Amino acid sequence: MTFNIIKLENWDRKEYFEHYFNQQTTYSITKEIDITLFKDMSKKKGYEIYPSLIYAIMEVVNKNKVFRTGINSENKLGYWDKLNPLYTVFNKQTEKFTNIWTESDNNFTSFYNNYKNDLLEYKDKEEMFPKKPIPENTLPISMIPWIDFSSFNLNIGNNSNFLLPIITIGKFYSENNKIYIPVALQLHHAVCDGYHASLFINEFQDIIKKVDDWI
C-alpha cells in the first residue's frame, strides 16, 4: 500500500506537529455511542457486533487522511492510502488474546467474510500476532466486552513515533430504552486536535445510525 511522504517544511501543520511531537503529547477521549438500531439490525441479519463495529471504524478512518497519518519504518512522515484493522480476539481457554489483521474493504459483506475466514484460521493460535507478516498500514482496535467504561487511557511511552489512533470499545449497556457502547480514542496531538477527535466520533455515530445503508 502506498505511503505518501509529507514534506514537513511545506506542511501547513508544521508548527503544530513540531510542538506536540517534541512534547510527545497524546490524549484520549471516550464517548458513548448509540447503537440501538445498529445492534437490532446486526442481530436480524445474523452479523456479529464486533466485526461490524470494526468495519464502521475503518470506514471513518479511511475516509479521513488525518487518521492515516504516521511515521513509517524508514522514519518518514506521511500518510497511507488505506489502513487495515489489527484487532484483538480473546481466547477463553488461555485467557489471553491474539491480534489479527484483515484487509479493509469498502463492501461490508466482503470485509465480514474476510474477517470470518481470518478468525477461523488464527483465533486459536497461541501467539500474540499469528497472522504474519503484519503490514505497516494497520490500525490497532480492541474490545473489552466485560465492562462498560466512561474513560479509558493507554500509555505508549516506549514508542514515541506512533502517531496513528488506537481505538478501544467497551461493553454495551442499556439506558432509557437505548443501547450504548463506549468508544475510546487514543490520539497523538502532533497530528490530531480536538476537532479531529470530534470528527471521528461524529462520523462514527453517523455511520452507525445509517446502518441500514450498508449492512
From Swiss-Prot:
Catalytic activity: chloramphenicol + acetyl-CoA = chloramphenicol 3-acetate + CoA
Gene Ontology biological process terms from the UniProt entry: response to antibiotic
Top-rank taxon, per record: Bacteria
Entry keyword set: Acyltransferase, Antibiotic resistance, Plasmid, Transferase
Enzyme category, top tier: transferase
Known role: This enzyme is an effector of chloramphenicol resistance in bacteria.
Protein name: Chloramphenicol acetyltransferase
Organism, scientific name: Staphylococcus aureus
Name of the encoding gene: cat
